[in-house]
Amino acid sequence: MKKFEQLRGIVAPLDRANIDTDAIIPKQFLKSIKRSGFGQNLFDEWRYLDYGEPGKDAASRQLNPDFILNQSRYQGAKILVTRDNFGCGSSREHAPWALQDYGFAVIIAPSFADIFYNNCFKIGLLPIVLESPVVDRLIRDALTVDGYQLEINLEAQTVMALSGETYWFEVDHFRKHCLLNGLDEIGLTLQHADRIRKFEINRRNEQPWLFL
């Protein structure tokens, strides 16, 4: 998992509440357990005018010109700003995978579904909770200012607009540590590899009958 320290990037505003995981990545694309390849089907039913199927070349499909991510000004966006209860619905891990594979590194909303929120941290995707009036302002600015950007500082736990406005956000200390150091669950386990090996040796010596 990549370390997350600071990020400055274009903001894509998605002015909808209660976006569920089926909208983020429709069920027909959940057959793979690899984390890559889901980005082309992110928000599939909104991004395209035709029905998406696994294996269908996204380059040959008809884009919905009205959908925000299809507008040229938001190409390359790293930060998604959206509304309440983002990621609700079924607890599919593919939803944060699709967002990350598309290119998003940060999701900002007034609230998230709990399981989705937890799944984001597991892959290094940073979900940030800001108050609704602040999100209102960010969405408004992203809709009206071409190339609108934000700067995210995880160490300081701040979101800063280029105008200088700064907003502080909360993040669990342990999750912050993992993101700053690029540690997923496997990485955390490997940090204690020596202690694990020592435990196994002692256990084998003290309870040899378990290994007969």
UniProtKB/Swiss-Prot annotation:
<keyword id="KW-0456">Lyase</keyword>
<comment type="subunit">
    <text>Heterodimer of LeuC and LeuD.</text>
</comment>
<dbReference type="InterPro" id="IPR050075">
    <property type="entry name" value="LeuD"/>
</dbReference>
<keyword id="KW-0100">Branched-chain amino acid biosynthesis</keyword>
<dbReference type="InterPro" id="IPR004431">
    <property type="entry name" value="3-IsopropMal_deHydase_ssu"/>
</dbReference>
<dbReference type="GO" id="GO:0009316">
    <property type="term" value="C:3-isopropylmalate dehydratase complex"/>
</dbReference>
<dbReference type="GO" id="GO:0009098">
    <property type="term" value="P:L-leucine biosynthetic process"/>
</dbReference>
<dbReference type="InterPro" id="IPR015928">
    <property type="entry name" value="Aconitase/3IPM_dehydase_swvl"/>
</dbReference>
<dbReference type="Pfam" id="PF00694">
    <property type="entry name" value="Aconitase_C"/>
</dbReference>
<comment type="pathway">
    <text>Amino-acid biosynthesis; L-leucine biosynthesis; L-leucine from 3-methyl-2-oxobutanoate: step 2/4.</text>
</comment>
<protein>
    <recommendedName>
        <fullName>3-isopropylmalate dehydratase small subunit</fullName>
        <ecNumber>4.2.1.33</ecNumber>
    </recommendedName>
</protein>
<keyword id="KW-0432">Leucine biosynthesis</keyword>
<dbReference type="InterPro" id="IPR000573">
    <property type="entry name" value="AconitaseA/IPMdHydase_ssu_swvl"/>
</dbReference>
<keyword id="KW-0028">Amino-acid biosynthesis</keyword>
<comment type="function">
    <text>Catalyzes the isomerization between 2-isopropylmalate and 3-isopropylmalate, via the formation of 2-isopropylmaleate.</text>
</comment>
<dbReference type="InterPro" id="IPR033940">
    <property type="entry name" value="IPMI_Swivel"/>
</dbReference>
<dbReference type="GO" id="GO:0003861">
    <property type="term" value="F:3-isopropylmalate dehydratase activity"/>
</dbReference>
<comment type="similarity">
    <text>Belongs to the LeuD family. LeuD type 1 subfamily.</text>
</comment>
